[in-house]
Amino acid sequence: MYPAILELPDQILGRKVPTDWAWWMKYVGTVLASDLTPEEQFDVILLNTFREIPQNEAGHFQGVLDFYFCGDPPHGDEPAPPERLLDWKKDALRIWGDFRVYAGIDLFTARMHWWQFMSIFRSLPPESQIKNAI
């Protein structure tokens, strides 16, 4: 059993959600980085995550953002975190290469929680390809 500090969430407002890094990158990260309007992003992300538009739309959407930002969403007065400056699709090979080189993880076969992925991503060294790109 892991200590409580290492428990990874698998629910948003009591509803089970996907946790795999690739799912979050594809169905939330790319939508947030898309040219869709904020209203379209809102609906697409809710439908992707819950397969419906929940009754408490705003609360569920905020829950998705909290999950996506690993419990530490940016505040209005803070600059966007570096991961928002990249294009998950365009930068995929850089990210894959950096995970292989610096963490010994092959993202083509790896299964891990989104928060684990982001923890490793954020800890990549400044000389990594992706950190140089952003």
Predicted regions mapped to residue ranges:
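Charged interaction scaffolds used for protein-protein
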Residues: 1-23, 30-134
